[in-house]
Amino acid sequence: MAAEVYFGDLELFEPFDHPEESIPEPVHTRFKDDDEEDENGVGDAELRERLRQCEETIEQLRAENQELKRKLNILTRPSGILVNDTKLDGPILQILFMNNAISKQYHQEIEEFVSNLVKRFEEQQKNDVEKTSFNLLPQPSSIVLEEDHKVEEACAIKNNKEAFSVVGSVLYFTNFCLDKLGQPLLNENPQLSEGWEIPKYHQVFSHIVSLEGQEIQVKAKRPKPHCFNCGSEEHQMKDCPMPRNAARISEKRKEYMDACGEANNQNFQQRYHAEEVEERFGRFKPGVISEELQDALGVTDKSLPPFIYRMRQLGYPPGWLKEAELENSGLALYDGKDGTDGETEVGEIQQNKSVTYDLSKLVNYPGFNISTPRGIPDEWRIFGSIPMQACQQKDVFANYLTSNFQAPGVKSGNKRSSSHSSPGSPKKQKKESNSAGSPADMELDSDMEVPHGSQSSESFQFQPPLPPDTPPLPRGTPPPIFTPPLPKGTPPLTPSDSPQTRTASGAVDEDALTLEELEEQQRRIWAALEQAESLNSDSDAPVDTPLTGNSVASSPCPNELDLPIPEGKTSEKQTLDEPEVPEIFTDKSEAGHASSPDCEVTSLCQKKAELAPVNTEGALLDNGSVVPNCDISNGGSQKLVPADTSPSMATKIHSPIPDMSKFATGITPFEFENMAESTGMYLRIRSLLKNSPRNQQKNKKASE
């Protein structure tokens, strides 16, 4: 019954299955006469022989197909069985008779027994339908019967599988075996039947077989971690139940580390260096197409690569442009000097984020930014691109990068250089004073006590231009030496550290003044400073303003002025200050009080007293009044800042550091109004502090 149903594989043979009477006769074959030959010398006899051989081959193939169809009918299983409910209905059972003595002997009896069961069930179903209907679901399983009855029943476990599973249907022949599905497909769904049981083969070879004359280096396997105490791989050494053997543990640990080093000898303590990477990829160069790359792209050396035409539309590669970019540290250095030109507001920070490029790193791409070599056609129309652009040429692109991305140190040409600025400009005055005062400050002793107010006033002092008219000098002061500004085209003055200037200044100082006269001039300077301090106390400005000279004028002692300063540094400062208007006190009402000129201060520095140079400049207070400002910066030079009451001139000079008065904006003073309970707390706990362990140890040491 089941053998008549086939899977459908017979349809493969339908194109070759023709009845004998339906075989068409060849109508296109025409033979010539026997005496006629073909142009190639082939006669009809040979053609007939070939045709006969072909017909014999066809007959053999048809006979072979018939044999295969017969075998296919034998090997195939029933298919096309449709089951309404797969949980309640299905094939009765599946029996596979293997090559066994029992199956050969009881083959017929087993088939008859199954047929009798089916007939008896059909008869019961006709007589009583209710008895044959079971409420319980069938138990789909396949049981493997063991032939060995000596095994105890307690140990025997039934190997139950799901319904319709493949137990195995392998047909073994002499030279091959055929593994055919032994279970019919249920509802044409192969998922209801399990797949094949893939056999597991034992590994015969454990080593790689190499070719003749070649040696294969097999990487040693990393040893498995084990207990160094007992050698077991099931637990670690900390969980070992055996007593510890220190000698064995150290020996096994050493063997394990040596084995790990041999297994990972290539990657053990290996470092990567940039030179190795460069050597590895050094043969690849941008813009250069090797023969291997040409073969990979399918182009020759007589044509441009396709990506060149695409680059004309997209532009220069951004990745290689990034390689040509010069890196900037991004650090900004503020030295306190005014480098602005009045274009930025006070307190504004100028961030220089300019990007520069190294033009030598620009890549040459023939056909894109340089001309195409001779003999290579420009096929931009075929690739749907554009012709070479003049703006993409290498020299044009380099000029664009140079003009639009300048170096950080290059300034624009619209700013005036310092040589063309007027000698009396405030900016030049500040630069000259800083350049003259800084060498003297650098050579002072670092352990000297410097007033705090002088440091703050030096770092935050404001330097307006000189006043229009000058007040008279104090009594007993020799007239200053006026040096008019040099006209344009005149060579500069002789440097102050030149031998001629140093010799002349030294001769005047040594012959003109004695030690008593120098001490008298020093007393006059101190008297002028004390009177300036009294003027500051009468003004409305706060006493602790960093721009005033109160803390400076009252703090230094004569010992602080006895500082060794080189003669060249002092004369240099004097020479730089001479082209300007003489520095004087700007308080017109106090005409009789001022400091001595620079020549006297220079002579003080060159004697044994070694006094510091004094620049008689005035300090500008917040209320507009001018007082002398004795600024001993780093314990060195004394500087009096010139004053100007014009606010318009003061606002034009900018500093990268805000004014000191702006640091206290929005800060309210703490008046200690609600601190009545907190006062006197130290007096209350002083007795406890005396009994502290630290004080007790000190008392013990003192008593010992």
Swiss-Prot record:
Q: What GO MF annotations does this protein's record show?
A: RNA binding; zinc ion binding
Any GO CC annotation of this UniProt entry? catalytic step 2 spliceosome
Compositional bias, Polar residues, is annotated for 547-557
Mention one GO biological process in which this protein takes part, according to its record: mRNA 3'-end processing
Q: Where is there biased composition of kind Low complexity?
A: 454-463
Provide the record's note on post-translational modification.
Answer: Phosphorylation at Thr-490 by GSK3 is triggered in cells entering mitosis.
Which stretches does the entry tag as region Disordered? Answer: 16-43, 407-516, 529-599
Modified positions (N-acetylalanine) are 2
Pfam families recorded for this chain?
PSP, zf-CCHC
Where do the zinc-finger regions (CCHC-type) map?
Answer: 225-242
Primary site of residence: nucleus
> Domain of life of the organism in this record?
Eukaryota
Sorted keywords for this record are:
Acetylation, Coiled coil, Isopeptide bond, Metal-binding, mRNA processing, mRNA splicing, Nucleus, Phosphoprotein, Spliceosome, Ubl conjugation, Zinc, Zinc-finger
Q: Where is the composition biased (Pro residues)?
A: 464-494
Compositional bias (Basic and acidic residues) at which positions?
A: 16-33
Q: Where in the cell is it found?
A: Nucleus, Nucleoplasm
Coiled-coil residues: 43-78, 514-538
Q: How does it assemble?
A: Component of a nuclear TRAMP-like complex, an ATP-dependent exosome regulatory complex consisting of a helicase (MTREX), an oligadenylate polymerase (TENT4B or TENT4A), and a substrate specific RNA-binding factor (ZCCHC7 or ZCCHC8). Several TRAMP-like complexes exist with specific compositions and are associated with nuclear, or nucleolar RNA exosomes. Identified in the spliceosome C complex. Component of the nuclear exosome targeting (NEXT) complex composed of MTREX, ZCCHC8, and RBM7 that directs a subset of non-coding short-lived RNAs for exosomal degradation.
Tell me its family: Belongs to the ZCCHC8 family.
UniProt note: domains: The C-terminal part (659-707) contributes to MTREX RNA helicase activity, in part, by enhancing its RNA-dependent ATPase activity.
Q: What does this protein do?
A: Scaffolding subunit of the trimeric nuclear exosome targeting (NEXT) complex that is involved in the surveillance and turnover of aberrant transcripts and non-coding RNAs. NEXT functions as an RNA exosome cofactor that directs a subset of non-coding short-lived RNAs for exosomal degradation. May be involved in pre-mRNA splicing. It is required for 3'-end maturation of telomerase RNA component (TERC), TERC 3'-end targeting to the nuclear RNA exosome, and for telomerase function.
Q: What protein does this entry describe?
A: Zinc finger CCHC domain-containing protein 8
Q: Which gene encodes it?
A: ZCCHC8
